[in-house]
């Protein structure tokens, strides 16, 4: 098998002999010992880890090198399971399961999952009721659906082969997916046989295929947090509905005697209109009939909105926010301890019989070939040195606990010179040195802030002076040329003073470069009268964002916003999955119901009215336009659901559908509002939690520490480099590894250096911030976790090595979960 070329999928079954030969034991750079029986399963914090090789009581049935290769691979699997938060009971139990595991955990399989799920979702564009231009014959879309479902069957078969039947049926999400698959399969066959579509509400369940994809892990986490937040949410929601019903009964008795008040004529109307009033969509319309009869009736509505909208709704957000904080902290704790357990298992597999107290470099290198296949030999050695805080030949378990953080570093040689222009002739050096001092000075930075502020005011004044949308001037404004020239000079001065590499390493500099480049393109569009590209000119105000760097609070807001973007994307996708499910249900029940003049007998008839009449010689059309908000196809349904999410006049759509169907249709719209309210509340709570967390961390840390990433500096001596190079030459390492090591050696010899310094960099993650925020509690978590492992061992939850097993199999992995 060829080596995988992606760090996200580091696990491979065998190594390509032409590219990466195994590194069996030798006497160089950390002499290798025989792996301990059953995969070196020493008691590491009271946890024993079986291996993929033979049982504990039987001698290894394969060469020592093969035993170590299997240990390296299984240790890498444990690390991957810890990183992905995969439960250890899904660990492959034999060679057959291992092959399936490796097939399931690669990007080809992930892409197959994703594309199949997208195909099933996109079929709703072609199935009845279809988008007119995309409509397909029943035979075609049913065949495509069966093909996609067969691919899902293949995916589940591979997971069954990996997990085994007992574990497969214990996996709840997989069983839900299997159940939906069976229902979808039966329906697709029925449609294909009948050659016509029927009511298929179960299509709303297709989202499970997308949610189960590896690439949609963020969506699964969001759904899990939504379900975890439901208990307190439901408590407050029941309180809200309780007060709503009390006020509905009170309103019915107070206002039903008014014949001109349609809002409280029945108890059902009272409940529905007070529910709509909670969203303020029908206020003050709902109050006016009773208010016209008795001005004191406004007290009823004021008290209702004060309790329901301003107190209970905000209480709902507060409760969800508090629950969300607890969930985030518990999630961090669980993942931290899960990773710690995975590291303990991996360490046990890498410890040898003769040296159980640590991991030699050779063992570590064998692990990294499976865990990080794209990592070069030089980077592996630097990673080993960065982990080895005790500066001993062996890597202790305490050092190995940092494997996840250190393995993510990107290593580059530290430049010997401070600036890019240090080796230039003296005259040029002095010029560029002066430019460097200038662009790094506070005066230069504040001058540019002043220019940006003046530019913003100028753009605002120009915009106020424009009339009738006539902003496509035939002439280039002189102010445009002046400010663009200043920005261009700033750009060239920074590139000259800092150097291209250092300049482009800053996110703000990249932003400045992008905005300046767009401004230049806008100048070309104006000069050449390229009307289709005039929109580029509108991007000029983006320069004003640079002013956010002036104030620390603004920087925190922007940093939080950028940190939230990936998570917000997953939250948006989560909301879209709910949209899809409700859109399918809406199409099945309300398709073709909303048409022009459809609701003439309802209270919202004007919103759906379409009248064509002639006044003199002109034909006048009066349209209510709300008939466009329908469920005739999936695209219209998404637009309609978004309008319902905004809640402005959403009751008009609800009443229009109700007038054409039944009063029970209101349950669909009310349920959708409650579901979107849950998701939106979670989104708001997430934003609040992230911002508060960032602000609290900023108070505890230096500002520069927050803004900068993580940097580790390590020195590699010439002797160490020669030893690593000799190791790879003797053991027939990959040609690329040897070449890179030789390049490093030649660079040392060129500059007559005995050592070279390397910098390992990575961005600071939420996990890093959490480690510092909770550092006082983390040690208590570790001690509690160790006690739990000890208790589980005493209770016999971690059995001893199994009896002799056939070659190629191993005992079930018993781990602490």
Swiss-Prot record:
Organism superkingdom: Eukaryota
Region of interest called Disordered, as start-end residue ranges on this chain: 20-65, 785-817
Tissue: Mainly expressed in epithelial tissues like lung, kidney, colon, spleen and liver (at protein level).
Keyword Transport among UniProt keywords: yes
Main location, first listed in the record: membrane
Catalytic activity: Na(+)(in) = Na(+)(out); Ca(2+)(in) = Ca(2+)(out)
Regulation: Na(+) current is inhibited by ATP in a MTORC-dependent manner. ATP sensitivity is independent of PI(3,5)P2. Probably regulated by Mg(2+) ions, cytosolic Mg(2+) selectively inhibits outward current while lysosomal Mg(2+) modestly inhibits both the outward and inward currents. In the absence of Mg(2+), NAADP readily activates TPCN2, with properties similar to PI(3,5)P2. Both current elicited by PI(3,5)P2 as well as NAADP are inhibited by tetrandrine.
Effect of gene knockout: TPCN1 and TPCN2 double knockouts are viable, fertile, have no obvious morphological abnormalities, and no obvious behavioral defects. After fasting for 3 days, they are less active and endurance performance is reduced by 8.3 fold in contrast to wild-type littermates that show no changes. Two days after re-introduction of food, mutants regain endurance and become as active as before fasting.
Protein name in UniProt: Two pore calcium channel protein 1
Species of provenance: Mus musculus (Mouse)
Taxonomic lineage from the root: Eukaryota, Metazoa, Chordata, Craniata, Vertebrata
Gene: Tpcn1
